[in-house]
Structure formats: C-alpha cells, structure tokens
Amino acid sequence: MLARFLSSLLKASVTALAVVVAFGFAANFARAERLKNLATFQGVRDNPLVGYGLVVGLDNTGDQTMQTPFTTQSLTNMLSQLGITLPAGKNMQLKNVAAVMVTATLPAFAQPGSQLDIVVSSMGNAKSLRGGTLLMTPLKGADGQVYAIAQGNMLVGGAGASANGSKVQVNQLAVGRIANGAIVERAVAAFQPDGGVLNLELKDTDFGTAERVVEAINRSMGGGVAAALDGRVVQVRAPQSPSARVGFLARIENLDVTPAKAAAKVILNARTGSIVMNQAVTVEDCAVAHGNLSVVINTQPVISQPAPFSGGQTVVAPVSQIDMKQQGGSLQIVKAGASLAAVVKGLNALGATPADLQTILEAMRAAGALRAELEII
C-alpha cells in the first residue's frame, strides 16, 4: 500500500510540474511571424498619384457653379479643347457637374496597361456624387509626370434624401470609388540594387529584432549574407542575376522570425478619448484622487412685449443660467500589476471616464507609477 501511495504521489507531482512548466513556457512564448510582416526592402514601395477632374451626369446634386468658379473655368477649358467655344461673359448655371480630386496608389513594379482603383472626392459644394461619371483625368506623381489616366462610373456607398427643409443622409455622399478606374501609362524606374546589396528596413526600430532577423537569414541562407547596420536597417547580399534574386528574396520574406518584446507604450487619442496600451505596460502601487468639474449653461429666450399703443417694439432677449458642479474624488489605491489584465483591472477600479483616465495616466507617468511611454495622437 505504501509503495502504491508513493507511486501515485510521484505521478501527481510530475503531472503538476509539467503543467506549471508548460504554463510558464506558454506565458513567455512569443509568436513567430513571417519576415515580410516585420520589414520591407528599401526601394520597393508604392507611389501616390493625384489629379483634378470633372464628374458629370449628377441628378441636380452637383456644384453650384456661381459659388465655385473653378468648376465653371474647368468646364469652359474642357469644352474649348473639344472645339466648343462659349460666348464671353456667359454664366453657366449647371447642377449636374462637380469638380473633384482623384487619388490613387501606384504599386511597385506596375507596368503600362495595369489597372488601379481610384478614389474620387468632391472639392466644391456638390451634395452628392451618386450616379456620376468621371471624365478622363490625368494622374500625376510627385515629379509632375503623368503615370495613369482615370475615367469611369463611380460607386458611392452613401444615400440621402431631402425635402421641405428636412434631410436624411447615410454615410458620405461626397466621396466615391471606381474599381479599376485608372490605367497605368508610365512605369516607375525599376528597382536596381547597388552591387547586389539590398537594405531590409524594419517597420519598427528595435535592435533585438534586427539581431534576430540577421540570425534567421544567416542560418537559412548561409553565414555573412546579412548584417545589421543599426536597429532598423539590415543589409543583405543578394545574387546579381535578377531571376535568382527573385527566388532569393522570396525565401527571405517567408522566414519565421520571433520579434523582440515591444517597449511598453500607451497611446492617448485626445480627440476621441480612446486609450490603447500594449501588453508590456505595468504599474506600481500608487494612490489616485480625481474630481470632476462640470459647467452647464442653459439659455432660454425671454420675450419682452410692450404695452398696447405704447410705440415700443417686441424684443427677444436671451437669459442664461450657469450651474457649476464639482464632484469630490476620494483617494483610491491602484495596486501594482505585472500583466495587462492586472493593469486594466486596477484602472477600472477608479471608475473614471476615458477623458479623466488620460489625465490620470499622465499624472501616474510623472509620478513614476506607470512603467510605459505615453504618446498622444
């Protein structure tokens, strides 16, 4: 009996130890990612394009041409290029034309004949671009060269209606998209590595991640292929032959690399009140007291009616009432937390709104209780 008891006790101890070890490994395990999600090759990038054009065929929802002279001027110039001359001083009061800006992104290695998606945005006072057709619009790059030509029927995701001063609108009506609405006419200069040397640029600067990238490349491709220049750029020696280089870079992009643990950071959005923090954020024990101050202003119109036949005038005078309330905040303890769940639990215990929580986090950072970098966007 004693031997059987000791045997079962030993098995239970080994099982418990295995569970603890497995849990420890799971807690410290960082998920590996493909290198293409962590870095990009310098020189392989998209290029923005922009153009100015006209949208026609709108159902009385276009620009009010008397208030947008650039629309009238653009329409006159376009008609003159088509051989149509308008009388001098003629004011065109049109409602089915709108001046727009057209934007697109030219991807790397795009060749003439490739098609691009474009976004069309109203720049005047058009009510809606629904049902409109974009006329041929050249799209230029930062160097002023035309790289694509855009034209086509737009798709507007919003909807709206108005009558007798009432208006209902869903989503944005002044912006539309045209799938495959532009055709590439000029290719960007091809990417040529200098002496077979490529620079791999990390999306986030981190010396630890850069070192791991170098180790992964050299382990897979051979020693001396990669070397880190700093915490963001890794230099890679690629084959001289273009065909061999493509396969070489494809293998590098699909290497699995475990990134280093990110620095603790808290992002505060002052416009929306949003707060985002990563898993590395920790807090120390601290005491927090925060009181809210609210000011409410109510304005009521008061009508002053003069006596009959007095010759006075009826006057509407606004009367304002101002109420100021301050809520006292008791001193509360925020316990130290080494995990994100513990940090969230401790901050939620304060019962503060997101706007108040931003101020509290700034004060905690100044007091040294918040172990994270604050970034306000």
UniProtKB/Swiss-Prot annotation:
Key words of the record: Bacterial flagellum, Periplasm, Signal
Primary location class: periplasm
Keyword Signal found: yes
GO molecular-function terms, A-Z: structural molecule activity
Keyword Signal annotated: yes
A GO biological-process term: bacterial-type flagellum-dependent cell motility
Family label: Belongs to the FlgI family.
PANTHER family: FLAGELLAR P-RING PERIPLASMIC PROTEIN FLGI, FLAGELLAR P-RING PROTEIN
Assembly notes: The basal body constitutes a major portion of the flagellar organelle and consists of four rings (L,P,S, and M) mounted on a central rod.
Physiological role: Assembles around the rod to form the L-ring and probably protects the motor/basal body from shearing forces during rotation.
Stated name of the protein: Flagellar P-ring protein
UniProt source species: Cupriavidus pinatubonensis (strain JMP 134 / LMG 1197)
Phylogenetic placement of the source organism: Bacteria, Pseudomonadati, Pseudomonadota, Betaproteobacteria, Burkholderiales
Gene from which this protein is expressed: flgI
